[in-house]
Amino acid sequence: MGQKINPLGFRLGTTQSHHSFWFAQPKNYYKGIQEDQKIRDFIKNYVKNNIIISPDTEGIAYIEIQKRIDFLKIMIFIGFKKFLIENRQLGIIKEALHIDLKKNFHYVNRKLIIDIIRITKPYRNPNILAEFIADQLKNRVSFRKTMKKAIELTESEDTKGIQVQISGRIDGKEIARVEWIREGRVPLQTIQAKINYCSYMVRTTHGVLGIKIWIFIEKE
């Protein structure tokens, strides 16, 4: 039987890099990983609950964390089109995040730096595309129409190929199934091919749907 591997882990060190940068004793690795996950979840929940996002606005692409003993730097890469453009507004959000993170994670003797960086081509990032698809499915838009629209968005940003897969009780059908669509090339077995990937879960009125996206950007 064929064995599946995470496309990002498969390419670490070649076309993909880590989003966490720190060192620890082997026995303390799990603590560092747990802290990173809590920070990422906290930031995503903060954005979801405190920032009004317009329909044509993308979300968080990914979060990079750099840690030392007395230093913590968090870089939030976002794809907002019309939001977070003004420096004043950006400063207010960064300051609020700074205060809440220090309060919730008890960073007293640790310098905390937060940077919010806007990515130029948001729909090359599968996380942002998955959020778009999830939003459409929640609003009961046809899954075929949604997948075709997702492909159009990525094609407009110089991608070489995309594959979208949706699984679960699609359109409220009683029997779960898997539907997928591919456009262009998606060479999953080529290590040198730079492929961005994400797995996303969305809750709808008919149950949970799984979304998987592979985007082939370039070959290095």
Swiss-Prot record:
- Where in the cell is the protein located? Plastid
Which SUPFAM superfamilies does the protein's record reference? Prokaryotic type KH domain (KH-domain type II), Ribosomal protein S3 C-terminal domain
GO MF terms, alphabetically ordered: RNA binding; structural constituent of ribosome
Q: Which Pfam families match?
A: Ribosomal_S3_C
Q: Which domain of life is it from?
A: Eukaryota
Q: Which GO terms describe its cellular component?
A: cytosolic small ribosomal subunit; plastid
Domain KH type-2 span(s) in chain numbering: 39-120
Which biological process annotations from GO are given for this protein? translation
Alphabetic keyword roster? Plastid, Ribonucleoprotein, Ribosomal protein, RNA-binding
**PROSITE patterns attached to this UniProt entry:** RIBOSOMAL_S3 (PS00548)
The principal location of this protein is plastid
Describe the subunit structure: Part of the 30S ribosomal subunit.
**Family statement drawn from the similarity comment of this UniProt entry:** Belongs to the universal ribosomal protein uS3 family.
Q: This chain belongs to which protein, by name?
A: Small ribosomal subunit protein uS3c
**Natural source organism:** Epifagus virginiana
